[in-house]
Structure formats: structure tokens, C-alpha cells
């Protein structure tokens, strides 16, 4: 049985966006599942769009996501080089084969002449086809002119796509196209076919936008006498409204931005796997190992998948909750509030253990934890905005805080003892938990939410808790 080999072949033209990552994830999952090879190839032949540093950004993004490659930049392999600009000699060999077999010719026309052909076709209200202007006696190709593919046969192609099923396209999609540009570099249409064949790629998995070009690819495969690989086109990632492809105007961001915003790599991969694939069950949260085990191309949907950032945040929260506390501690090093800098690691881990379940992203950490490191300034508008507390007059709230202060002064400061003291306060004040606990929580944190009150007070400690209660009492409105 032939070993499965897949690839991801990005162009270094800028940041990696969501669609790029999914185009890397699906072939990576398939290769990992089948114990095959996953090749990273940098398609850098379009020098006009080349962005300095983009290759390094691609590599670092894949590193962060945990998408490792069997062959490619940094790791090498038997099928290198893995940058197309370093493979010119390979394209020259295959180009010469096409010339020798009568399937390629040097393009003798100037841009002005080509434009004249286009203008004439437009005036005659017909489609412009380059094959209608093939030179009868083209010059010998010396590498300074563009080299064009001479489509051998104008026919309808039918092929099977592992996701989309049987597809067909007619002669209207076929025309003579450039194989090698005048700068000596190949076009994508030519280079990727040569590279995939020489690198032993068995499954070509890419975006749906490539379907329209399939007839020209298939024609070139046949002219090169190369067996077709398995093709799989992934459905579009749609904007939230489901009406168009996701774009920058719809809030599409680079993966690096999501990383900065505190999204976990495993959550991002889980989310992107669900953009067009499911395992047929109700399961939504997957580990990387589960994705590798369950992934299959026949479970990839044909229709577009909506990009729902709220779902990404939900998944991220789920993955944060699953992390071991020491692992999470390593990941939040750069997300702590500045006031945490002098705290011990032991104390920060204790704080993290309390707030872990409330984090949707790592950037939520400062808001969820800052009051553990510095006494906040009282904000009594939070009491008036609270559904339970706004029913009580400020004087009543101050009285409750005084009672709580008195009770907690004589309480051992561990969660169980604090809970018992709070229960006693409920009985003595006749208040509901929602009212009593809310005012104490506000007084010590001035935050809309906090972990369980006994745990919060115990971690703050008796001295800090009593001091904050007293500050709240002293600052309480008188009317």
C-alpha cells in the first residue's frame, strides 16, 4: 500500500489567516492518522508579492499550533529543496520535456500585441482565448520569453474529488497558460504539479477556489504523463451571516492576532477542524489526539462553514478548563496584570486555580485576578447596578458589611470555616445569599464576578479581607 503523503504549500506574502491554517490542518491530520508524511513547501515564485519575514512567520505560526512537518524548511528531507525559487533546474527539465513533446512553446508576443488580441475579441463580442493566437512558427525558447503550455486536447474533464464527489468541467476552462515567466520562475499552475509529483504527494487537499482551474491542471498532468493524485477541495469558510466568504471586512484576523488575544493553539485547531468537518457525533470539544484519530475526508461537508467567533471563545474556555494548572501557569506568564509581578509563583498558581473556570481567553486573566494583587478602589455604582443590592439603601448595605466584618474577625481563615461563618451571617441577618454574598464580594473585589466567596476570602487572607471590608464601610454612600 502506498504511504499517504500530504502537503501544505503557503506563499510568503503576509500573515497566515484562518483559511491557510485549515488548509494545513486537514492534510496534517490525515497524514498523522495514516502514519504518512506531511510536507511543508514554500511557494515563493511570485516575487512581486513576496513579504520579508513572512516565511519565518509561517514557520513560527505552525510551531505554535503544533503542526509539525515531516519534510520541509529547517528539518530537510529527501525531496528538497523546499523553496520553489531553489528548484528552478527541476522546472527547466520538465519544461523541456513538454517542448520536446510539442506541448509548450515560447510566447513571442509583446504585451501590446496581446492587448490588441483582447480588444479585437471584445469588439467581436467573443471570449478571448490565447489558443486562438498560437504562433505557427514560435521561436526557440531561450528562457527570456514566457513559456506557454499548449493544451493538447480541448475536451471536457471529469474527475472525482474526495470531498465534492464527481465533478466535470468543459472546454471553456482550457486555454494556453504560462508555465515559466520571463524572469525564469514558474507559475503556480506548473510548479505545484511538478513539486507534488517529485515529492510523492498522494493527496492534494486545498481550498474550493482551485476547482475552476482543475481542467488546466488535469490537462497538464496528462501532458507530463503524471498520474493524478487524490484531490480534495475544502468548503469555503463563510462570514457569520453565511452569505459570503470570510474576509477582513468580516473580522477575519491573522492567527498571530488570535494568539496575542489569548486563544490556545488546541482550541484554534479544534475550532478550525469543525469548520467543515464533524465526526458524526454530538462531541464538540476534541483534543489533538482525538482529531487525529477521528478525522476522515469523507466526513468533510460540501457546503460552506460559518465562522462563529463566539464559538471559538467558548471552545477556548473549554480547553482552558481542561489544562493542568502547571501547564496553564506556563501559558499565562505574559498575561498577568502588572501588579502580580511581585507575587510568589505559589500565590499566583493559587489565584489561577480559582479563576481558571472563568477564563474564556488568557487575556481575561487581568480582569479576573487583579484584585488578588492590589486592593481595588471602591465603586459603589456597581452596587446600584446589581439586581439584588439595588433593593437596599446604602445605610443597610453598610450595616451588612459591618456585621460581616465583626463575624469574620473571629473566624479561622480557611474555606470551610469561612463558609460556616457566612451561613451564620445568613441566619442572623435574614438576608438571601444573593444579597449578602454579593455585597461582601463587591467589597473585597469590586469586580462583577469572582470565584466561590469562601475560597476568595481565604486566599486574600484575614488581614486583607478585613481591611477591604473596612474601606468599603468607610466609603459607603450615606444616602
Where are these regions (language model features)?
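Small-residue-rich helix-loop
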Residues: 325-429
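Conserved phosphate-binding loops in nucleotide/dinucleotide-binding enzymes
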Residues: 81-85, 180-181, 199-211, 238-271, ...
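N-terminal Rossmann-like or analogous alpha/beta NTP/dinucleotide-binding catalytic cores
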Residues: 1-121, 212-226
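Active-site cores that bind ATP or allylic diphosphates and position pyrophosphate for catalysis
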Residues: 97, 105-233, 239-246, 254, ...
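Residue-level signal for inorganic ion chemistry
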Residues: 27, 58, 98, 102, ...
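Structural motif
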Residues: 16-18, 258-266, 302-308, 342-351, ...
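Charged substrate- and nucleic-acid-binding regions of tRNA-handling and nucleotidyl-transfer enzymes
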Residues: 413-476
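Glycine-rich phosphate/pyrophosphate-binding loops
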Residues: 32-44, 190-203, 224-238, 451-454, ...
